[in-house]
Amino acid sequence: MATKLPLQNSNAANVAKAPAKSRAAAGGKTIEEMYQKKSQLEHILLRPDTYIGSIEKHTQTLWVYEKDEMVQRPVTYVPGLYKIFDEILVNAADNKQRDAKMDSVQVVIDVEQNLISVCNSGAGVPVEIHQEEGIYVPEMIFGHLLTSSNYDDNVKKTTGGRNGYGAKLTNIFSTEFIIETADGKRLKKYKQVFENNMGKKSEPVITKCNKSENWTKVTFKPDLKKFNMTELEDDVVALMSKRVFDIAGCLGKSVKVELNGKQIPVKSFTDYVDLYLSAANKSRTEDPLPRLTEKVNDRWEVCVSLSEGQFQQVSFVNSIATIKGGTHVDYVTSQITNHIVAAVNKKNKNANVKAHNVKNHLWVFVNALIDNPAFDSQTKETLTLRQSSFGSKCELSEDFLKKVGKSGVVENLLSWADFKQNKDLKKSDGAKTGRVLVEKLDDAAEAGGKNSRLCTLILTEGDSAKSLALAGRSVLGNNYCGVFPLRGKLLNVREASTTQITNNKEIENLKKILGLKQNMKYENVNSLRYGQMMIMTDQDHDGSHIKGLLINFIHSFWPSLLQVPSFLVEFITPIVKATRKGTKKVLSFYSMPEYEEWKESLKGNATGWDIKYYKGLGTSTAEEGKEYFSNLGLHKKDFVWEDEQDGEAIELAFSKKKIEARKNWLSSYVPGNHLDQRQPKVTYSDFVNKELILFSMADLQRSIPSMVDGLKPGQRKILFVAFKKIARKEMKVAQLVGYVSLLSAYHHGEQSLASAIIGMAQDYVGSNNINLLLPNGQFGTRTSGGKDSASARYIFTKLSPVTRILFPKDDDLLLDYLNEDGQRIEPTWYMPIIPTVLVNGAEGIGTGWSTFIPNYNPREIVANVRRLLNGESMVPMDPWYRGFKGTIEKTASKEGGCTYTITGLYEEVDETTIRITELPIRRWNDDYKNFLQSLKTDNGAPFFQDVKAYNDEKSVDFDLILSEENMLAARQEGFLKKFKLTTTIATSNMHLFDKKGVIKKYVTPEQILEEFFDLRFEYYEKRKETVVKNMEIELLKLENKARFILAVLSGEIIVNKRKKADIVEDLRQKGFTPFPRKAESVEAAIAGAVDDDAAEEPEEILVDPESSSSYIPGSEYDYLLAMAIASLTIEKVEELLADRDKMIIAVADMKKTTPKSLWLSDLESLDKELEKLDLKDAQVQQAIEAAQKKIRAKSGAAVKVKRQAPKKPAPKKTTKKASESETTEASYSAMDTDNNVAEVVKPKARQGAKKKASESETTEASHSAMDTDNNVAEVVKPKGRQGAKKKAPAAAKEVEEDEMLDLAQRLAQYNFGSAPADSSKTAETSKAIAVDDDDDDVVVEVAPVKKGGRKPAATKAAKPPAAPRKRGKQTVASTEVLAIGVSPEKKVRKMRSSPFNKKSSSVMSRLADNKEEESSENVAGNSSSEKSGGDVSAISRPQRANRRKMTYVLSDSESESANDSEFDDIEDDEDDE
């Protein structure tokens, strides 16, 4: 191997002479002159900017050190000269990283001698000959290019050197360069001199030194000619001196730094930063700049202060001054800006601050040690190394970031944001000009002129109100009156962003019309185009909201205007007008309380008045508009500013910062508190607290349901109309929307109403546990979470059979019905037999509050109600969703509520296939499929090889095909987490309106149930009182009717050929009990009022007719005089007396009945309906599984499962004997937590009627199953009870659902010694003549029988009570439960001219007649019914499933609740109705 020759001297003698030059053919230059090759040394001298930067003078504003302080000023310097000095200085600092014992750096800058020296202690350069290069190491690294100790990138170094130039560049650009070093390890001292730009060198001088001597010193004289300089100028010296201070700041207190023999007074990086801040503070008049410091670790030290409008940074990487920053500065700054952005936007969401905005307000100092740093050039002004290669992390602490946030930067940014916003908003400023072009503005002629202060701008709610205002303006003229219609509600500018405000055309128009200038302080209106703004809106809640938004708009930008007298006024119109019949006397009422007060003063006698409601300005005619403007003093109310409380009230209503205060404001609302519209002035605080609060309460009520019935007002209106219109027959949803608007005074959008109806009928998994309406059509599925429902024009609905059991008709008379526009509408709340808010859950977001209540198992709710009735403690309930096959487990609990984890189901089919068979609640199939398809691997490839969906609208069935590698990755991460098969819900945000209408937070479902229980029990007591009262009235009627008939038959009372008044007087004299009908209330004469109950027969109540004026005179004996002529028979008397005897017994029995018994009876009825739902759900699930098997069989998909996901743990066994009530309750439930039911079997029937049931019972009985297990192998239909062997009657008489049940049916319900006649669905159903009380006054009655008809009632002998009939076996058929059809051949329609010409015989008498008719028509009726298909056979009572008895035990989560961990409250938001 050849020995490598030593390096040659880098002087001109070493350069070989070129051969003789050959001349080029043209151009006067030889080829050699045109194309040259330079040595590296020549290249550096020829192109120095590549290595040391420019050698020309530059002027730049920089920090320099002079006169013992830091100064920022323009500096003229040569960057190349500064760089060669910096290279030697950085080398000295680098030695600290090599030798921690280094303790001093001495710098001398001698201007006179043009000499600079840098000496540092610590390990010197090894004084030893390099074995490969054959020269001493000091000469090698200082005198030969591309030599360095930093070439090994496998070794992480935190020094400045990297490329092998460094000190050699200083040598090259110096006339003299001296290197001296002492190597104590080798006891040698080294000195060598280079001259002529490293072109000449002396031989090294080696001498001995002590072991303790370790240092290195570089002395050089810059070649000033190459920098176009003659001496070291002051600016250059000041810049070099500042660089020495840099080194002192970077090295810290362990190294003493001297400059020209004087120690630098900087012992830490913090001291160094203070030099800058002290200098900056001299020019500040406000508080000194803050200095926030954090030494993150040994490699990172950060200081932060404030800057004004421009980002500043002072940073170092391994002692190198990165004057242009770099990735290390970005790394630190991004953490600070992200924190500040969040803090600013939290304080003012409209600030719209971005990271670069924050950066412009920061001054950041960074001192970092970074492994093997990389820069943009040899000048090393910018670090370019990626953050991941830094070799260390700089994660600023939260405490430090908070301190930065409190340093004033947030306030600075908020001020800057305000300034920017104002600047943007000023672009839309108005001006006092004579003419503005704004669409739909009817400008006043004098607006913007010298009389502008006298002009009034009327702002109306929409175009229709504008028409009224223009009609009224014709009275005043258009010189001083302008009109502008608002398009709906104005933007809440207090919470809007600048972009929203500037893009809002309405606000821009108002500023132009009024001549408003942004944020100007107005002491008067002289500079405006209008001197007064008058708000003219509807007298409803939305109208109040519009007023409030306009007030908020002015207060946000021009609060002083609200203090200008009479600037802001409102124009009010009557809500109700009462006109005296026959005269022109008109009374106007401007508030409902005022009207109610007048109505009460009439004492019910308002028949002489016509009442008209004015809900909107559009109701008033043009003539009325002129009338209003003719008397402006009566209709115009001035808003008055009293004190700062007015401003606080406005902020309370509209500021997001006042959320908690707004909650308290709404909580303290007292119903009935309202503005007195008779006062001429209104303070802003009164407006907010007495009028605007009504809108907020209405908004809240539309969003948060009632604890009592679980309904929002819109849903309650739907149910109110459903009871009237769709109890028996289905109707299009679109039609029902119209009826709800008509009959319940619904004033909002039809689309939201249709959505609410659809929502009440939905029954897919995750929607309702019990849907109150039936979904006859496509009402949405779990495929898209209900969004796939059909248009309201195409789908039908009707009342679900279970709804009337949940909301018994007997309670309707006890409810507090509302009245709007003189129309009787829905009650304040309905009174279900269990808290339906727990059954179907609730969700919503309103003013100040939101709510989320999960669904719970109705079986568990019923069981807990029974426990409360028995004086036992409730069993805690967990959320439950009908049809959901996954698990719901309590994962955390604390005082504020519990958190539950909802988990879907998956199975491992084989090594590469996962089957998902259930998703968490409210995770829909389509969304989930999109999620699966979006999953990617780390390299961007699809995670699954294929996603196969076998699910339908009711089921979940996905097969995920993936590689073995991805299967392993998914298993390691966890299938539940990877495939998002879990979600959480919480009970920490359960807000509801209580029975008094006050918003209240509930912590547990048991708390809701307990509060409901007390109220519901109170209403059962009221129901009993009402039933007893009605029965006693019926008893008196029976006695009076029998006595009346006998008196007529005996001639004691003569009715023919006499005046009614005389007969009434006879009856009064003979002591017959009067039952007058209620007189029509004052609302009966209201224009346009529609009340579907108007056609109902007036209520008859036992009263003293002399003492009340609210009843119709002469009507007190109509119940006798309106009896049919056929009733005047001895048989009828006997029948009435028999009914009376029964009634006496019934009254006595009812008085003995307890409210508890009534409730238990209703719960028993509910249990039966739930069993029908169980059966249907089981059948549906069986059909789903069969269909899925067929789909898989056709597609060839795998059916066998390798491994199944863990099932829900089975309930723990207990040796404790269950209580009797618990055993009974467990036997009711078809909603067991056991998911492995092989067979659903109905129990054997009791003895009942051997009738064939109608076909629809199959449908109704199987309406819905509530088992958590849907894997049912077989469904066995129930057998009917044995009953009387009788045939179907000739014609079943239709009963309107919105009538009360017949008295006999109600009595049977309360007669607990025998089976109820209706609620238990016995074989025999009592029949009554059906009377349609709808508005068209049409009566449906049974026509006479064609053959085998019964004899006239007068010729019949009274029959004793019928003996119990034997009941035959029942089979499930398809007739609706409770439906009594009427044969088409037997129906006749008869128009009645008066609502009072009905038969007035008692309910009991009609019942008795009906039974006789049924008995006499057995044979003929049977054949007739078979032909017509319109008759319905008796329905036997469905029995509970013969399932094993269950006992209630605590689940794992309940028994271990003491160990539950704390969790954070989860607040959910939701939607309107």
UniProtKB/Swiss-Prot annotation:
The keyword Nucleotide-binding applies. Mg(2+) 2 binds at D538, D540. It comes from the Eukaryota. It catalyses: ATP-dependent breakage, passage and rejoining of double-stranded DNA. Gene3D superfamilies: 3.30.1360.40, 3.30.1490.30, 3.30.230.10, 3.40.50.670, Histidine kinase-like ATPase, C-terminal domain, Topoisomerase II, domain 5, Topoisomerase, domain 3. Residues 1-20, 1195-1230, 1242-1297, 1313-1473 are annotated as: Disordered. GO terms for molecular function: ATP binding; DNA binding; DNA topoisomerase activity; DNA topoisomerase type II (double strand cut, ATP-hydrolyzing) activity; metal ion binding. Its cofactor is Mg(2+); Mn(2+); Ca(2+). GO terms for cellular component: nucleus. The record marks R793 as: Transition state stabilizer. The active site is at Y794 (o-(5'-phospho-dna)-tyrosine intermediate). Control of topological states of DNA by transient breakage and subsequent rejoining of DNA strands. Topoisomerase II makes double-strand breaks. Eukaryotic topoisomerase I and II can relax both negative and positive supercoils, whereas prokaryotic enzymes relax only negative supercoils. This is DNA topoisomerase 2. The gene is TOP2.
